[in-house]
Regions:
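Hydrophobic beta-strand-centered segment that forms part of the acyl-chain substrate-binding groove
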Residues: 45-77
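C-terminal output/interaction extensions
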Residues: 109-131
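A structural microfeature
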Residues: 104-106
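Catalytic strand-loop segment that frames the active site of acyl-thioester-processing enzymes
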Residues: 1-31
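Hydrophobic beta-sheet segments that form the core/acyl-binding groove
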Residues: 64-99
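Conserved N-terminal beta-strand and adjoining loop/helix that marks the start
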Residues: 32-36
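Short beta-strand edge segments in extracellular beta-sheet folds
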Residues: 15, 97, 109-113
Length: 131
């Protein structure tokens, strides 16, 4: 985790497919929940190779502004930057562009977890459901 430092940057691309869209009676456009998922996954992918074995990140905070529509079939690009590291908390700034303009801005936080510890905690909840 010592390799996770502010200033780490990356880019991800996605072609907007029907499953990323909503219509609301008009043309199919990139929907906000898909923009959130794209931002989260892109930030995860940026830092995942730098984590220790047995670690993973989970999203904890998302603040997003969806600024403009993007039609189905157009590519979108996420430009991510890790802007803050506070122990296990990672804060990112993400800008989302389509082929013509800035379409979204996101502030996102992820938390580095130990997979085994998180799994134990989850198993306790699953066991409690079975009672």
């Amino acid at each position: 985790m010592d390799t996770l430092k502010p200033g780490l940057k990356g880019t991800a691309e996605l072609t907007v497919a029907r499953e990323h869209c909503t219509s609301r009676g008009g043309p199919w456009v990139f929907m906000t929940p898909a923009m959130v998922q794209f931002s989260e996954q892109s930030c995860h992918n940026l830092v995942a190779p730098l984590l220790a074995a047995g670690q993973h990140t989970v999203g904890t905070v998302v603040y997003i502004k969806h600024l403009a529509p993007t039609p189905e079939g157009m590519k979108v690009r996420a430009d991510m930057e890790l802007i803050e590291v506070d122990r296990r908390r990672l804060k990112f700034k993400v800008q989302i562009f389509d082929e013509m303009e800035l379409v979204g801005e996101c502030e996102h936080e992820r938390f580095v977890i130990d997979v085994d510890k998180a799994g134990e905690r989850l198993q306790k909840k699953i066991a409690a459901m079975k009672r």
